[in-house]
């Protein structure tokens, strides 16, 4: 069982429950260049909430991306992930990329009007959530896990949302 410190947080440990092993990866040596796809997530695991965008600039391990805010929350503590573009949608005024978040590669620490910024190879403080769903009518039990990037304003909503999503599966 994972220990949580007195403030209710734990540092991200790149290990997962068996149900997460195929999707939960950490890449300590990730490299991004301007134009690369990048993701930002506030939850990661069996349930993920986040967005993807484009890297604007790289200075060593520091990156600037999106060119617009994610949630416009200032100082933040989110997962940075790599991302894979799987399709595009064209439009007359603007187009969109369809992408998936991938491996955890760092921490997003700024979410400002001009974009998001973060550091490769550092990781956010997180709150681990594990939900066990027992369906007596089907005679089966499933366990789901996720990590929520520590943010007091989102913690209750996201943990409740993860529990609800687990019940809905």
Predicted regions, residues:
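Terminal presequence/propeptide segments associated with secretion/organelle targeting
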Residues: 1-169
């Amino acid at each position: 069982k994972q220990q949580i410190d007195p403030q209710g947080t734990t540092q991200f440990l790149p290990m997962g429950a068996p149900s997460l092993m195929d999707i939960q990866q950490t890449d300590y040596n990730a490299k991004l260049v301007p134009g690369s796809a990048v993701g930002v997530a506030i939850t990661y695991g069996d349930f993920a909430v986040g967005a993807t965008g484009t890297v604007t600039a790289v200075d060593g391990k520091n990156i600037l991306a999106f060119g617009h805010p994610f949630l416009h929350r200032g100082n933040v503590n989110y997962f940075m992930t790599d991302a894979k573009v799987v399709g595009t949608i064209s439009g007359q005024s603007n187009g969109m990329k369809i992408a998936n978040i991938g491996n955890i590669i760092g921490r997003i620490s700024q979410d400002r009007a001009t974009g998001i910024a973060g550091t490769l190879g550092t990781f956010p403080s997180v709150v681990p959530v594990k939900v066990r769903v027992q369906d007596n009518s089907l005679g089966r039990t499933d366990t789901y896990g996720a990590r929520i990037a520590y943010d007091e304003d989102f913690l209750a909503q996201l943990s409740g949302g993860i529990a609800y999503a687990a019940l809905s599966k």
